[in-house]
């Protein structure tokens, strides 16, 4: 199971961020995702040979233009990440500007090409209907974008709806690795995600990571 631990609390200081990441690293997580300002602080804690250190780009709303987003990706790579989490431009998706979405992805890929950078995209499933989500995932497939988060996890969310959206994308895009985002994970959610075939989950809580590891060892 792919487990991503993410920090989205901008009030979190560097010391606390290090403490949280140190807590989850020993649990064998797959990825750590942080804002740009925490990359250098956290880099020494992540084994880049076996784990992803990723940076949020244009998070959470995806409101910047392509040039700004590409520049942010370039700076994150220079800072030391081996992965980037890109927020889907909501205005493009809402207005079904699929060609513009392709242009945006192409520009991001050009920055990452040859640098062994994993590109992951973040959607906000509540903003788009299923037809739009499916079309966007087809575009991801065409660009060999393999990791998709159906939700930012930034806003108040219904985890059950999130899991339903994740399962829908998984069923319609078998080549994509769907990672479900959520804050409060209970055993019933762990059970649902384990049975669903979804690739993994993202959490913002070290406590959830520990609980999931215990759940897996007990089952």
Show which residues each predicted segment covers.
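Hydrophobic faces of well-ordered beta-strands that scaffold small-molecule active sites
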Residues: 1-7, 30-34, 51-59, 82-86, ...
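Conserved N-terminal beta1-alpha1 strand-loop-helix module at the mouth
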Residues: 1-78, 135, 139
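Alpha/beta catalytic cores of nucleotide-metabolism and tRNA/nucleoside-modifying enzymes
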Residues: 1-15, 167-179, 186-219
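Active-site-adjacent beta->alpha loops and helix N-cap segments on the catalytic face
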Residues: 34-52, 64-68, 91-112, 128-133, ...
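Glycine-rich phosphate-binding active-site loops on the catalytic face of alpha/beta enzymes
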Residues: 59-60, 79-93, 142-159, 183-184, ...
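Catalytic cores of alpha/beta
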Residues: 64-78, 128-139, 169-180, 184-201
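Short, electropositive alpha-helical surface patch
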Residues: 110-113, 134-145
